[in-house]
Amino acid sequence: FSGATEATMRVVDRVSGLIGDAPPSLMRPMGQESKPGMTEWQHPVNHFLHANILLNLNIPSEWNGSFTTGPHGARRYKAPTSINVGNTGMTVEVGAATIVNEGPHGSDTHTVDAGGCAITAMPTWPQLHPLSVPDGILAEANQRDGDGFPTWLSSQ
């Protein structure tokens, strides 16, 4: 898993250049009003700095050195258990017979299967929460640059 450490540290290196000495909403001094102002509202980086967006990394054990920012895909497991009855008793085996990945090309499931590090910008708060991030901002936050990193992270 040494590749996972390297990939994580490369993302941390990019992020640490943004944060500065003190994030703008450290300890949420104004409660639910601790969010980007109206002039900052439309920019994913401001939601990240206010801790309303987080970066989720999924990295395979054998990382190929690439990064891809994109949405989450879905992973389903078919026949996740099997029960075997034998002469000496019953055994239960846990382990999917088939793993099915769904989602668009560039989603985390497909990226990890291809050996890449998947970066997904996710909301910290659920929908309908006063600090939730609009869907359009999340969609923009998951756009990638030529190196596979979030465009908002690279444009700072």
Model regions: which residues?
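Electrostatically charged, flexible surface regions
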Residues: S2-Q156
